Amino acid sequence: MQLEKMITEGSNAASAEIDRVSTLEMCRIINDEDKTVPLAVERVLPDIAAAIDVIHAQVSGGGRLIYLGAGTSGRLGILDASECPPTYGVKPGLVVGLIAGGEYAIQHAVEGAEDSREGGVNDLKNIGLTAQDVVVGIAASGRTPYVIAGLEYARQLGCRTVGISCNPGSAVSTTAEFAITPIVGAEVVTGSSRMKAGTAQKLVLNMLSTGLMIKSGKVFGNLMVDVVATNEKLHVRQVNIVKNATGCNAEQAETALIACERNCKTAIVMVLKNLDAAEAKKRLDQHGGFIRQVLDKE
């Protein structure tokens, strides 16, 4: 796909005079364009849902969720991956973010890294990619060689693959088994795909990881019941989670949390079923960690 023909490289008429307007009008123009992004994502919700189901199936079978991108796209994948362990209590290696150019590229531009097909393949080899894993290639343009080569390699291994881009019919979309293509249109600053395209990618990644965690029993109601209390704020959040899930008071919630080494799920089952920590944990284990199943089936 030629660069000048890509939607993400087009000229936006709404911002054609943005360098001549007041600061407030500048902000309004950007904000008006940003409002279109959730609508673009809404149009691809069936594609996102299909990807979530595949990701969940693979992760349930022992696989991992691997994000692969360059520049802003790579950083967004790393951001999403890094938030999963503290929010949902999963092991750090379950959701992995890879960026062209390696760790240095998280904060710095690495010239030519996104053009390296070998880099995409080698980064996946270095983490021991297997057929159980799901690789999600992220590229606003849909033409990034690092991502395309990584997706091709993943498919050769038998991995399920997802391609996220903002240009229809892109190489990333056609290479991946599942394509998620929110069309956000031309950027306020021509070609600056860190803006609307980046926002769309972030919204999609939010759904992929959150959907995976909900389907994995990491959410009860709308509560993050596997949150790890790594600071004072999260200690308080744990107490509030147990309170909200059970209707108990703060003292009862804290007592239950202390008894089960601050595991929210166990504390919730303890309170709701009037069990000690060991029995509550046993019942959760019997039902794969799903609070809802413990409550509904016993």
Curated annotation (Swiss-Prot):
The gene is murQ. Pathway: Amino-sugar metabolism; 1,6-anhydro-N-acetylmuramate degradation; Amino-sugar metabolism; N-acetylmuramate degradation; Cell wall biogenesis; peptidoglycan recycling. Homodimer. It is an enzyme of class 4 (lyase). It comes from the Bacteria. One of its GO terms (molecular function) is carbon-oxygen lyase activity. Residues 55-218 form the SIS domain. Its EC number is 4.2.1.126. It comes from Escherichia coli O7:K1 (strain IAI39 / ExPEC). Specifically catalyzes the cleavage of the D-lactyl ether substituent of MurNAc 6-phosphate, producing GlcNAc 6-phosphate and D-lactate. Together with AnmK, is also required for the utilization of anhydro-N-acetylmuramic acid (anhMurNAc) either imported from the medium or derived from its own cell wall murein, and thus plays a role in cell wall recycling. This is N-acetylmuramic acid 6-phosphate etherase. The active site is at E83, E114. PANTHER family: GLUCOKINASE REGULATORY PROTEIN. Belongs to the GCKR-like family. MurNAc-6-P etherase subfamily. Induction: Induced by MurNAc 6-phosphate that releases the repressor MurR from the DNA. Repressed by MurR in the absence of MurNAc 6-phosphate. It catalyses: N-acetyl-D-muramate 6-phosphate + H2O = N-acetyl-D-glucosamine 6-phosphate + (R)-lactate. Keywords: Carbohydrate metabolism, Lyase. A lyase-type mechanism (elimination/hydration) is suggested for the cleavage of the lactyl ether bond of MurNAc 6-phosphate, with the formation of an alpha,beta-unsaturated aldehyde intermediate with (E)-stereochemistry, followed by the syn addition of water to give product. One of its GO terms (biological process) is N-acetylmuramic acid catabolic process.
